[in-house]
């Protein structure tokens, strides 16, 4: 896979966000000073914006320093791309008066009436948005799917000692039990740890 989709992969891996949440994240949703990320929308496959999947999916959390450093660099790269492409650079808008449809227009065309700018983080160098299915197909060729990153993020946090309730809040789950049942009940490290604990009891 080339680097085209790296921003989305990086976001999903470091945050556990759903693919629609990552693709719908804008620079306005990220505080590059504090590291706080707010999930307030998702991008649907049919090129519309919508509220996150559930009520608890609307959330905020803090990203790690590595991701924030990468995002700072990415924002600078996008600014340079906008200069390089000039008036041909593509800008993304949300048509709030037309079912929140996504509108993409070259920079030289004024923003349409009823639209709001949506400076997406996950865009191609030209400013064009990713196609959901193309990204999913690229992941599939690597034996992955968009949920792989969500699963990995959660299991690694729980294995490292994070509280399930905190991981659930980070992922946007309504109940920590969901997080435990879906991600953490059968991880390899946890099975090994169980064996070590049992071995310690037997040896006493």
Question: What do the predicted segments below correspond to?
Answer:
Residues 43, 171-196:
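Catalytic-site neighborhood detector that most strongly recognizes the C-terminal catalytic loop/helix
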Residues 10, 14-21, 134, 138-141, ...:
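C-terminal catalytic core of tyrosine-transesterase DNA break-rejoin enzymes
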Residues 29-36, 143, 162-182:
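Short, polar N-cap/turn motifs at the start of nucleic acid-interacting alpha helices
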Residues 1-25, 32-33, 57, 66-69, ...:
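Basic, Lys/Arg- and aromatic-enriched nucleic-acid-binding interface segment
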Residues 63, 122, 139, 154-157, ...:
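Hydrophobic, well-ordered secondary-structure elements that form the walls
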Residues 34, 47-48, 52-67, 73-81, ...:
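C-terminal secondary-structure termini that scaffold catalytic or DNA-interacting sites
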Residues 2, 49-58, 122-130, 142-148, ...:
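Short, contiguous acidic/charged loop-to-helix segments that flank catalytic cores in large enzymes
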Residues 103-123:
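Intrinsically disordered, low-complexity acidic Ser/Thr-rich regulatory segments
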């Amino acid at each position: 896979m080339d680097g085209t989709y790296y921003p989305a992969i990086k976001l999903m891996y470091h945050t556990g966000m759903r693919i629609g949440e990552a693709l719908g994240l804008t620079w306005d949703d990220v505080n590059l000073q504090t590291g706080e990320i707010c999930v307030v929308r998702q991008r649907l496959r049919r090129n519309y914006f919508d509220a996150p999947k559930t009520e608890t999916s609307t959330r905020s959390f803090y990203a790690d320093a590595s991701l924030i450093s990468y995002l700072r660099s990415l924002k600078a790269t996008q600014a340079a791309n906008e200069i390089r492409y000039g008036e041909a650079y593509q800008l993304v808008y949300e048509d709030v008066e037309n079912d929140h449809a996504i509108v993409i227009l070259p920079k030289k065309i004024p923003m349409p009436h009823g639209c709001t700018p949506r400076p997406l983080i996950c865009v191609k160098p030209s400013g064009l948005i990713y196609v959901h299915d193309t990204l999913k197909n690229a992941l599939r060729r690597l034996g992955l799917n968009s949920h792989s990153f969500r699963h990995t993020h959660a299991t690694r946090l729980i294995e490292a000692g994070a509280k399930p309730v905190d991981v659930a809040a980070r992922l946007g789950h309504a109940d920590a039990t969901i997080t435990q049942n879906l991600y953490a009940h059968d991880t390899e490290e946890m099975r090994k740890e169980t064996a070590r604990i049992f071995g310690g009891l037997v040896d006493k």
